[in-house]
């Protein structure tokens, strides 16, 4: 192994470890490694504790297979229960770090400036808006896999081995979330630019097969879900607020700014962004124009379609503004930064352009890094397991509550009702007093004691 390759491997390992650690340490209060989040424990860990990997892989949750979450949760179930929070969070953070490394290598095929490649790479684990809801959460890895799929499609490898690896990435992404289909337009750019167009068609073809499997599962085994009605006219405003304005302010300032200026500011920001994007698209070279255009198209689609399916209720509340639903903005924001990087990639002086972008994003990251998240208030997994152990040792154990969310969602849902030798361990978010329990891990006392 020559020195260059050795340095590359060493730098890659160092980055993955650093990016993983940063995600685990993000936010105030309790850290991600001591809090089990919602479906991570209430669905996927419960499944892994009760069924085989194959059973879990073919059982949908919330309308899709969520393969990546189940691949992580299954080995976690074999560990001591007290390790579950740390193992789930570390697994999720490691996957995100590896995706960022993949982006670094693929982006070199379409971006020339080192700062542009650093931007689209570092924003994966450090995205300011990821801290509130999706940081180090197994349940939300499918958003990051969609971003990975975008990159392997827009910048396809030229070797057979590279195509095999890319096919594995898009298959995992598509089998985790059917919405990954929204990044398929990137394949057009990748195929047109590739000197080996037939080979470049392999990865999109594999993705279509995986999406067909997801479609069959969704049609035959999934139940529909809608949180609210969809008002189509609100979707542009939601994109302007939660993506464009959020990209300028970060999460911590978004609420105060929106409450102060309302949709008028959102409209102004949207109009200015459209004018600037049009000018930069006109000035950009062919590669930058293609990558930026497909990035913007996929960014808008990845907000409009998921939110349209979920319902638009709550996103534009001004007086009681909330960051709830920020998971729907992760892919749109990541792809928006791809467009920014592609449009500014060739501008000179590159050092100045890259420095301005780096300072701008660094201020956001530092501002949002300590912002509260859905995990900040716990409950602490270590403390909860200790309480469960004490409850299992008590001579008279009170009846245990049954979580409302089943381990298997959809038409084949199987609610978990605690047995006489089971204990219920509540996970985040804890419901308000008087509200039914949503998410919990139901574990046998024999496993809790062990």
Where are these regions (language model features)?
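Membrane-interface transmembrane helices that cradle and orient dolichyl/undecaprenyl
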Residues: 149-165
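Transmembrane alpha-helix segments characteristic
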Residues: 17, 285-316
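Alpha-helical transmembrane segments in multipass membrane proteins, preferentially the mid-helix core
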Residues: 153-158, 187, 275-281, 334-346
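Multi-pass, polyprenyl lipid-linked donor-dependent membrane glycosyltransferases
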Residues: 130-149
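Intrinsically disordered, polar/acidic, low-complexity terminal segments
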Residues: 2-50, 54-131, 160-161, 189-191, ...
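Hydrophobic/aromatic-rich transmembrane helices and adjacent perimembrane loops
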Residues: 141-143, 316-345
């Amino acid at each position: 192994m020559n020195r260059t390759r050795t340095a590359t491997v060493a730098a890659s390992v160092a980055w993955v470890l650093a990016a993983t650690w940063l995600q685990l340490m993000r936010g105030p209060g309790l850290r991600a490694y001591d809090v089990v989040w919602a479906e991570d424990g209430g669905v996927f860990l419960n499944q892994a504790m009760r069924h085989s990997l194959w059973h879990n892989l073919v059982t949908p949750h919330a309308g899709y297979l969520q393969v990546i979450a189940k691949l992580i949760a299954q080995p976690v179930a074999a560990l001591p229960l007290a390790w579950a929070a740390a193992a789930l969070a570390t697994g999720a953070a490691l996957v995100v770090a590896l995706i960022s490394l993949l982006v670094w290598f693929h982006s070199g095929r379409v971006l020339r400036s080192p700062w542009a490649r650093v931007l689209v790479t570092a924003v994966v684990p450090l995205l300011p808006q990821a801290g509130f809801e999706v940081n180090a959460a197994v349940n939300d890895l499918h958003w990051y896999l969609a971003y990975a799929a975008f990159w392997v499609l827009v910048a396809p490898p030229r070797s057979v081995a590279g195509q095999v690896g890319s096919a594995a990435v898009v298959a995992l992404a598509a089998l985790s979330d059917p919405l990954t289909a929204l990044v398929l337009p990137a394949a057009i750019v990748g195929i047109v630019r590739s000197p080996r167009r037939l080979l470049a068609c392999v990865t999109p073809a594999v993705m279509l097969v995986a999406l067909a499997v997801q479609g069959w599962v969704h049609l035959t085994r999934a139940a529909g879900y809608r949180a609210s009605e969809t008002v189509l006219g609100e979707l542009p405003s939601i994109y302007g607020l939660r993506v464009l304005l959020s990209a300028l302010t970060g999460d911590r300032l978004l609420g105060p700014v929106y409450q102060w200026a309302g949709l008028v500011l959102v409209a102004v920001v949207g109009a200015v962004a459209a004018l600037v994007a049009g000018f930069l698209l006109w000035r950009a070279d062919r590669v930058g124009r293609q990558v930026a255009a497909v990035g913007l198209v996929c960014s808008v689609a990845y907000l409009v379609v998921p939110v349209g399916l979920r319902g638009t209720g709550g996103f534009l509340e001004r007086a009681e503004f909330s960051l709830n639903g920020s998971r729907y903005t992760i892919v749109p924001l990541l792809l928006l930064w791809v467009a920014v990087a592609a449009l500014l990639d060739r501008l000179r002086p590159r050092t100045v352009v890259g420095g301005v972008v780096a300072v701008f994003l660094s201020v956001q990251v530092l501002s949002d890094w300590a912002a509260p998240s859905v995990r900040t208030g716990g409950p602490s997994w270590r403390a909860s397991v200790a309480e469960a152990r004490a409850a299992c040792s008590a001579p008279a154990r009170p009846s245990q509550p049954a979580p409302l969310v089943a381990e298997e969602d959809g038409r084949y849902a199987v609610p978990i009702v605690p047995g006489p030798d089971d204990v219920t361990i509540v996970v985040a978010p804890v419901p308000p007093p008087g509200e039914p329990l949503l998410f919990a891990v139901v574990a046998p006392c024999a496993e809790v004691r062990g």
